[in-house]
């Protein structure tokens, strides 16, 4: 009996010791893992680079937004502030706040620009601390080290909770929990990148319900991550994006096609029909409001009239700013100055700026369907300066609702409005108003707004080809894009923030254009006058960078006097907080522009 009791006592002592040893080993392993993680944190930069290299093909849309983001908002990550003249050496990385990864067609389920733009949050652009989590992380019970610490009766009495807890209910994360969480996220991304790289072509397919493995929790986590700005495999097989290094990928993809390096293809343009403005004739016009209608394109032998009357400055806000001038001026002919060549559409927009009223018939396009006849007739009868434009907009909406019975018909209506808006820049503002009224019109689950934003997104991805093949359509697309941003609003009254970076990209490319310089600068100037205030409210850092480029271009000796005058007016308007300039300053720019285009 004594031997058996001694044996049982020794076995109990051995088991208790082994228990203590196991707990000690778990305790040591947890801290060893912590210090290993600390050592791996130093390799985060290299990990970002490896993750970047794995993304060999990205969408054209996200790649093209790299330069405005890389060069504007570097201090969003707590880095050095940008230089005064807009140095382009800084870069922006919207860590965890990448709206483009959530709104491109490469993201989960083929989401496009119309991913509820009113719900996009821009507040995290300005987070100063890179690794500060949105919410404090709870304390982690490391491998059950706290197990068995409380005996029966030692728990907290909930009735006396106020006596137990301190006055401040918050808690601080442990020293390295933020870094550990970030590193775990980085490990998961690198693991997913390696798996994606090892898959055969065509293997990047979303998991079907029939292929679910027992580990469905991980599959659900991947889906949840894609809704939070992460990524899921795209049906087309293209690699997906992560928010933490999206902008570096944009920059990497954009280095292949510098904006200014268009080659010789830009010299052959189908739609560039230029003519010199000669012998302007003066025509008195009656005062009108809104965007005035424009002439139909004239042949190069036709004389281009220049306006003699301009509206007085209006109050700030809205796309009516660019039509704010009224001044009687006699053009002066300067024989020694070289003649400035503008596109026909640019001359039309300049006449609209100078408020010349030309009521001309609009050519009716041949409808593909009989139901479209009346809609196109109403659409072509709309004039920007007519007093009954709102009535015609309402008539068009009612007719569209009555005749639209399928998704194809709705798509045809959107396509008709879009084609007219990008081909006739004078109609862009009216088209944007019409689109705003019909934004929530839905047929078979498809919204008018979704189809419109998809068309804008498609043209944005091929804008370089548009610039080389059809410069008129390129300028018309940029004009309509800015008008949509300045006019359309979400259901909560907010502008479509998803359009902010595309507009900045297009405006920067207008300033960098080496071919139709005056036309591009004129387009950039007029769009900044109409939407500059709203753009700066959404993303002021990129406006600072854009205006720095405008100053550099204005000081370049090779630029024409018209270019310098237009850019100087924009810079002065920005210095006046986008409020209308005083009448003497407005008259000065009016005379200068009229002399330079005479």
Swiss-Prot record:
SUPFAM superfamilies: ARM repeat (SSF48371). The modification Phosphoserine is found at residues 18, 299. One of its GO terms (biological process) is regulation of translational initiation. Residues 43-55, 258-272, 321-336 have a biased composition (Basic and acidic residues). GO terms for molecular function: RNA binding; translation activator activity. The modification N-acetylmethionine is found at residue 1. Changing residue 389 to L: In a breast cancer sample; somatic mutation. Residues 1-18 have a biased composition (Low complexity). SMART domains: MIF4G. Residues 1-305 are annotated as: Interaction with NCBP1/CBP80. Coiled coil: none annotated. It comes from the Eukaryota. GO terms for cellular component: cytosol; perinuclear region of cytoplasm. Gene3D superfamilies: 1.25.40.180. Specifically required for the pioneer round of mRNA translation mediated by the cap-binding complex (CBC), that takes place during or right after mRNA export via the nuclear pore complex (NPC). Acts via its interaction with the NCBP1/CBP80 component of the CBC complex and recruits the 40S small subunit of the ribosome via eIF3. In contrast, it is not involved in steady state translation, that takes place when the CBC complex is replaced by cytoplasmic cap-binding protein eIF4E. This is CBP80/20-dependent translation initiation factor. It comes from Homo sapiens. The lineage of its organism: Eukaryota, Metazoa, Chordata, Craniata, Vertebrata. The gene is CTIF.
């Amino acid at each position: 009996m004594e031997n058996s009791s001694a044996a049982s006592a020794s076995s109990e002592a051995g088991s208790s010791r082994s228990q203590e040893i196991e707990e000690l080993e778990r305790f040591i392993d947890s801290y060893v893992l912590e210090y290993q993680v600390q050592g791996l944190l130093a390799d985060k930069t290299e990990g970002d680079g490896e993750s970047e290299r794995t993304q060999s093909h990205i969408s054209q849309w996200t790649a093209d937004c790299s330069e405005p983001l890389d060069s504007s908002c570097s201090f969003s990550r707590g880095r050095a502030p940008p230089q005064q003249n807009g140095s382009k050496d800084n870069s922006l990385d919207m860590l965890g706040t990448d709206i483009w990864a959530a709104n491109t067609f490469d993201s989960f389920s083929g989401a496009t620009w119309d991913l509820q733009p009113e719900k996009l949050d821009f507040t995290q652009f300005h987070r100063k601390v890179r690794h500060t989590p949105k919410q404090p992380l709870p304390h982690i019970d490391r491998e059950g080290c706290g197990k068995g610490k409380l005996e029966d009766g030692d728990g907290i009495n909930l009735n006396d909770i106020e006596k137990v807890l301190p006055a401040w209910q918050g808690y601080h994360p442990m020293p390295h929990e933020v870094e550990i969480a970030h590193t775990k996220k980085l490990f998961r991304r690198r693991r997913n990148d390696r798996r994606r790289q090892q898959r055969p072509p065509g293997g990047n397919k979303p998991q079907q319900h029939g292929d679910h493995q027992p580990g469905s929790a991980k599959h659900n986590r991947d889906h949840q991550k894609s809704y939070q700005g992460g990524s899921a495999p795209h049906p087309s097989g293209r690699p997906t994006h992560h928010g933490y290094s999206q902008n570096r990928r944009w920059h990497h993809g954009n280095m292949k096609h510098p904006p200014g390096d268009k080659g010789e293809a830009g010299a052959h343009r189908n739609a560039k029909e230029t003519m010199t403005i000669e012998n302007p004739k003066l025509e008195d016009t009656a005062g009108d409001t809104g965007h005035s209608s424009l002439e139909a394109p004239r042949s190069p032998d036709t004389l281009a009239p220049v306006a003699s009357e301009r509206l007085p400055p209006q109050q700030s806000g809205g796309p009516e700013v660019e039509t704010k001038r009224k001044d009687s001026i006699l053009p002066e002919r300067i024989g020694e100055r070289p003649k400035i060549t503008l596109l026909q559409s640019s001359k039309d927009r300049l006449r609209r700026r100078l408020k010349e009223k030309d009521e001309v018939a609009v050519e009716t396009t041949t409808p593909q369907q009989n139901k479209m006849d009346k809609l196109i007739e109403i659409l072509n009868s709309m004039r920007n300066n007519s007093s009954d434009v709102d009535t015609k907009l309402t008539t068009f909406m009612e007719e569209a609702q009555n005749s639209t019975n399928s998704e194809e018909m709705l798509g045809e209506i959107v396509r008709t409005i879009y084609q007219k808006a990008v081909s006739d820049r004078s109609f862009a503002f009216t088209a944007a108003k019409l689109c705003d009224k019909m934004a929530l019109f839905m047929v078979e689950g498809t919204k008018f707004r979704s189809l419109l934003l998809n068309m804008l997104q498609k043209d944005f991805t091929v804008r370089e080809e548009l610039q080389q093949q059809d410069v008129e359509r390129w300028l018309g697309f940029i004009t309509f894009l800015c008008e949509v941003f300045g006019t359309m609003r979400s259901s909560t009254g907010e502008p479509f923030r998803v359009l902010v970076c595309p507009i900045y990209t297009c405006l920067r490319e207008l300033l960098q254009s080496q071919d139709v310089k005056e036309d591009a600068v004129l387009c950039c100037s007029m769009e900044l006058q109409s939407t500059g205030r709203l753009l700066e409210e959404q993303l002021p850092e990129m406006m600072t960078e854009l205006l720095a480029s405008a100053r550099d271009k204005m000081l370049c000796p090779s630029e024409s006097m018209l270019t310098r005058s237009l850019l100087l007016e924009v810079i002065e308007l920005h210095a006046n907080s986008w409020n209308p300039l005083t009448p003497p300053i407005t008259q000065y720019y009016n005379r200068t522009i009229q002399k330079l285009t005479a």
